[in-house]
Amino acid sequence: MKLIVGLGNPGREYERHRHNIGFMVVEALLSRARAQLNQEKFAAKVGQGTLAGERVLFVEPQTFMNLSGRSVAEAARFFKVPVADVLVIHDELDLPLGRLQLKAGGGSGGHNGLKSIVSSLGDESFIRLRFGIGKPEGPNARERVSDYVLSNFDDGERREMDALIDRAMDMTELWIREGLSVAMNRFNRKA
């Protein structure tokens, strides 16, 4: 069994925010798997399905981003999913919009959701699908990060979203079918 986690903030007001791209990808994967988030446990919405021939547990933590580790750790422990079979899909400021990257382990890069997961799992070696959202530019860019991640994609960016989410789903399915190295070699080089 694989555990696929989409990071985001709960609530309709956050639904289309850049910070919620993890939820958006999980929703698309659920459609591909003909599954749904039909349970509430581990302080998360949870559903099971089959993707690329493998049983998958889908999780969308319903805590806010900085507490999402609790949901991930509880689900992984309950279903006895090894950390190497946990994929966390999250927004990534350090990648430009349109760039997707798979990687195993690493630090949190300042991402509070990842910090929480690392702390709760006690292990940073889980797989990440980093979905580039770009970052604010210009004067006071650092101070504007919070407003930026909690903003909606603009019209031009929204037009790109379907293709990017499709690519994220393809990356996820290849990771399930053929492993991380194959998926990284195929997709991480593409812009």
From Swiss-Prot:
InterPro entries linked to this entry: Pept_tRNA_hydro, Pept_tRNA_hydro_CS, Pept_tRNA_hydro_sf
Broad EC category: hydrolase
Keyword Cytoplasm annotated: yes
The organism's place on the tree of life at top rank: Bacteria
Site keyed Stabilizes the basic form of H active site to accept a proton: positions: 91
E.C. designation(s): 3.1.1.29
UniProt entry keywords in alphabetical sequence: Cytoplasm, Hydrolase, RNA-binding, tRNA-binding
Subcellular compartments: Cytoplasm
Cytoplasm found in the keyword field: yes
Catalyzed reaction equations: an N-acyl-L-alpha-aminoacyl-tRNA + H2O = an N-acyl-L-amino acid + a tRNA + H(+)
Any single biological process term in GO: protein quality control for misfolded or incompletely synthesized proteins
Residues annotated as site: Discriminates between blocked and unblocked aminoacyl-tRNA: 9
Primary location class: cytoplasm
Pfam family, one: Pept_tRNA_hydro
GO cellular component, one term: cytoplasm
Molecular-function GO terms, alphabetical: peptidyl-tRNA hydrolase activity; tRNA binding
Entry annotation: catalytic residues: 19 (proton acceptor)
SUBUNIT field: Monomer.
PANTHER family: PEPTIDYL-TRNA HYDROLASE
Function, as annotated: Hydrolyzes ribosome-free peptidyl-tRNAs (with 1 or more amino acids incorporated), which drop off the ribosome during protein synthesis, or as a result of ribosome stalling.
Family that this chain belongs to: Belongs to the PTH family.
Name of the featured protein: Peptidyl-tRNA hydrolase
Natural source organism: Myxococcus xanthus (strain DK1622)
